[in-house]
A protein has these predicted regions:
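Positively charged n-region of N-terminal signal peptides that target proteins for export
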Residues: 1-5
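Bacterial N-terminal signal peptides
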Residues: 8-22
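Scaffold/interface architecture of coatomer-like assemblies
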Residues: 26-317
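Short amphipathic alpha-helical "recognition" segments used for binding
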Residues: 6-8, 27
Length: 317
């Protein structure tokens, strides 16, 4: 998922609107092909330095197993295609230490470009309580920030709330992303292990909707705020969620709060500025389902970051 290119394509605007208005990262009819193309947002990340080199369509390779798929489009999400809806999703179970970060979150929201609409929601009892719908009025969005309730039992599972946000978020012709601020602990599921079904469901929901989730860890309230075991699993869950949706999780500190969110917010901003829409032709299958994919580039020194799978509709008869 990374930046800058200047692609031609007179059909790009039509293609982009068609792709995103449907939901995102699954196969739909491509405006550039009579075959069904799958679409996924990719972030381009330099291995060294701060600015990635130019990546062209012919530099991108998509694999399903050992089979290479045809790349149809590679559109830089800049200029006329820079539209983004970004939700800041805050866990109301967070401890009061989050209060020291609110000013930096507010500055991050207010610094977004005019092409970005920002929304704010709070996780409460498994529901995403929307305090501000996505808006281009960034000052208005920033006003929706407040201290978390920090009361035990407020949040059933942060992953219930994420799924709820995804399902109530209207389809749009813009890219969509979530910044999730939470300790990641699933108090509803209880024990920490690799089988949390609510985390898996949230990953599926976000993936099918083409929504990239990034996360910043912040300690919760009460006993879990200083439980190494619970904090460990909470951060593992946040990392898995971000990795599997094409985002990034920040701060592996376990029981303590991050000193500052600023480095993470700056990194997130750079990621959002270096994204492309990739369209490719997956192998035809009779049944709809997830396809595991692997991205490579002919250009040295860059990583192409995306969800590791894409939802593909059944082959039309």
């Amino acid at each position: 998922m990374r930046t800058s290119i200047s692609l031609l394509l007179s059909t790009a605007a039509v293609s982009l609107a068609w792709i995103f208005s449907g939901q995102g990262a699954w196969a739909q009819q491509s405006a550039t092909s009579t075959e069904a193309a799958a679409h996924i947002v990719v972030t381009v990340e330099p291995k060294h330095g701060s600015s990635p080199p130019e990546i062209r369509k012919e530099d991108v390779m998509v694999y399903e197993g050992h089979d290479r798929d045809q790349v149809v489009d590679w559109i830089p999400l800049q200029g006329d295609h820079a539209g983004l809806q970004l939700f800041v999703l805050i866990d109301d179970e967070s401890g009061m230490s989050l209060g020291t970060q609110l000013d930096d979150i507010r500055k991050f929201i207010e610094s977004q470009p005019p092409t970005t609409k920002v929304g704010v929601a709070y996780m409460q009892n498994g529901i995403a309580r929307v305090a501000q719908d996505p808006t281009s009025d960034h000052a208005q969005a920033a006003k929706a920030l407040r201290l978390p309730m920090g009361a035990g039992g407020v949040n059933a599972s942060p992953y219930f709330s994420l799924s709820d946000l995804v399902k109530k978020w209207p389809a749009t012709n813009e890219r969509r992303a979530v910044l999730m601020i939470s300790d990641g602990i699933d108090r509803y599921y209880g024990t920490g292990d690799l089988q949390d079904p609510y985390l898996d469901a949230a990953i599926d929901d976000a993936g099918k909707a083409g929504i990239i989730v990034s996360a910043i860890y912040t300690p919760g309230a009460g006993h879990f705020a200083h439980s190494y075991w619970q904090s460990y699993w909470g951060q593992i869950y946040l990392s898995e969620l971000a990795d599997k949706t094409g985002g990034e999780a920040y701060y592996i500190g376990f029981t303590g709060a991050p000193v500052s969110f600023v480095p993470y917010l700056q990194t997130l901003e750079k990621r959002l500025q270096n994204q492309y829409l990739l369209s490719f032709l997956p192998k035809p299958e009779k049944k709809a389902g997830w396809r595991q994919i692997r991205l490579q580039s002919e250009i040295a020194g860059v990583d192409l970051i995306s969800a590791g799978r894409v939802w593909v509709a059944a082959e039309e008869k």
